[in-house]
Amino acid sequence: QLNWSNINEGSCQYAMAFSDNSNCNGFYAPNYGRNWGSTVSYAESHDEERVSYKVLNYGNSATLRNTSNNGQRMTRLGSLAAQMLTAPGPKMIWQFQELGNEQTTKKNGNENDTDPKGIYWNYLNDANRKGLYDSYSELCWLRRSNPDLFSQSATITMKCTASDWSAGRYTHLVNGG
């Protein structure tokens, strides 16, 4: 049985351009003291607010200049996807996260809204959202095409915390096969 690792807060803080509480190292289970491969990590779920929604509504306007700028938002979300999908272990991509869906998951404040959500295939007609989708696609291809990089015997260095903000965040993988 797999455990869940909720990285929503760190993901949202990073994407909104706030360094405080922006730790995304938990996308890799051993960084949280869990066994390799024991945990499905995620940035979004039915219980958590969508990252794109939070960037749009609460993003750091001093850093992002214009939080409603679709291209800038999709670029931040693509960078977050890279942090999530280059970390070994199972991941969950939730309901059009790969297209930057900004539909809220809440109703009446903080109550979870589990009603069916709209399906926006027309998002693929937006070049910025299509770019985000392509980023997810390429990152998934990278994982499938290089299983040794994501194996238990691979060596991983993740620098995706608030203290890595100024120097730049990265994940370094060394082939384990």
Spans of features found by a protein language model:
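Active-site-proximal helices and loops of the catalytic beta/alpha 8
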Residues: Q1-E48, R65, R73-M74, S79-T86, ...
